[in-house]
Amino acid sequence: MTSGQGYRHLIFGALGQDGSYLAEQLSTNGDQVIAVIRNSSVVPKEYSNKNINFIRGNILDGGFVYSLLERYKPTHIYNLASASSVSESYLNPEQSLQVNLEFVRSLIDCVDRFRMAHGQDIFLLQASTSEMFGPDHQNLITEEAIHDPRSPYAEHKSLAHNLCIQARTTNGLKIGTVILFNHESPRRPLNFVSRKITRGAYLISQGVRKELVLGNINVQRDWGYAPDYVHAMGLIATDFLSDDFVVATGQLRSLDDMCRIAFKVAGVLDYENYLVSDKSLFRPNENSGLKGDASKIRDKLGWKPIVTFEQMIEKMVFAEGKESPL
């Protein structure tokens, strides 16, 4: 991800998995990076020496958001803010609605107002999700695949995605979207199943835990490595591409695969003996088996995933030992 063009990048969701990697990558090329975080957020120590300007505020306050545009006059905005847990969206659909849909509506309005006031286009990159497509697709998912959302999270992200397309085609705003398939890293929060598995494997290998309780381990997903996907975002933004791009590996792996690899990396070969199935953890309307077709971004920008599924899990298990020293 190279620039050095004097761009000004405004990132919403800057302390999340994707936002943190994006802020780091952008800060290395000499551009200005403004990272918007919650008032209650604590900035990790490792960011202290990086060229990132952290701004606290409530992104659901449209006045605050527009004031950022007036103050910093960004060339790029990245919306990575998301209430991204599918299961939690059932428990708190209002939060999902406000963050995943209404904030996007407000952000588009702010960008449009800024353009009318200053005659300056701001490139907006919206992070969309493969959850929009539902569980019944038999073929590789392309950018044109029909949406069939099956959860509050998926429904709100689908509506937000369509808002972006409408604003681009009707109002001429410079908006790109990345349709992200599942992607993990050591920075995934612990409430996500990938971290639950890598943390569990590490703790079991150290004799601290006796079992790992999971839902349906036969679920299959198209999993990639988060920094690879963030690199795709940078390529799209650098070229100001007002278009939609699937970012995926095109390969399916199961939760059982993830468990086997994680336990092997941790030095535990009989992993099946430590797994406990809890049917209460089975997700309704599970989006299993979706594969993404990333040929569009590969052909246009030369992007392809670098880190393999096995390498990703290895990185995550090794990171558990550093984060949770015993």
For each feature predicted by the language model, list its residue ranges.
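Catalytic helix-loop patch of NAD(P)-dependent Rossmann-fold dehydrogenases
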Residues: L91-D109, H118-F123, E131-T177, S185-R188
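C-terminal substrate-binding subdomain of Rossmann-fold SDR/epimerase-dehydratase oxidoreductases
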Residues: T28, A35-V36, A201-L326
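Conserved internal alpha-helix within the Rossmann fold of NAD(P)-dependent oxidoreductases
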Residues: G62, V104-L107, M233
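Rossmann-fold cofactor-recognition segment
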Residues: N49-D61
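N-terminal Rossmann-fold cofactor-binding loop
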Residues: V36-S41, I59
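N-terminal Rossmann NAD(P)H-binding glycine-rich loop of SDR-like oxidoreductase domains
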Residues: H9-T28
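NAD(P)H-binding glycine-rich loop region in Rossmannoid oxidoreductase-like domains
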Residues: I59-V99
